[in-house]
Regions:
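Hydrophobic alpha-helical
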Residues: 1-59
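Electropositive phosphate-/nucleotide-binding environments in soluble metabolic enzymes
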Residues: 24, 73-76, 80
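Short, glycine/charged-enriched secondary-structure capping and boundary segments
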Residues: 33-36, 64-65, 85
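Residues at the C-termini of beta-strands that transition into short coil/loop
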Residues: 53, 74, 121
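Short beta-strand elements at the ligand-binding edges of bilobed clamshell
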Residues: 64-76
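Hinge/cleft segment of the Venus flytrap/periplasmic-binding protein
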Residues: 77-121
Length: 121
């Protein structure tokens, strides 16, 4: 991240505008690198950083104004969905049998499990 910040900087006229990470650990690393470059210290000079998992440490960074947001995935909802799919196959059915109560994308084997955003208390 530090090398990216030196290549894409205000001085070079091509600044990083947004950082989206696959998890909060990566987002926290990005925040740390940004802080080393004078951004996201809580003083308003901020590059938005988003993560996934809604960890306590990420929520704290968000509440301090150092990180922008995170997504909390529904682990129980995902587990329940998987159990339903496994049960269908175990009982001799099709993988997507008994999914009428789920949010299923038509034409593909994909089920959407709701999530929640967190952008501060």
């Amino acid at each position: 991240m530090s090398s990216i910040l030196s290549e894409y900087s205000e001085t070079n006229g091509n600044m990083v505008e947004l950082i989206i990470c696959n998890n909060d650990g990566m987002a926290e690393g990005a925040v740390s690198a940004l802080q080393g470059a004078g951004y996201n210290t809580g003083d308003g000079k901020t590059i938005p950083v988003f993560g996934v998992d809604a960890t306590d440490s990420a929520k704290q960074l968000i509440n301090e104004g150092k990180m922008t947001g995170t997504i909390k995935q529904d682990a129980e909802g995902m587990a329940s969905t998987i159990v339903n799919l496994v049960s269908s196959v175990k009982n001799g059915g099709n993988l997507m049998d008994n999914t009428s109560s789920f949010n299923v994308d038509e034409g593909v084997a994909k089920i959407r499990v709701p999530y929640a955003t967190y952008t501060g208390e």
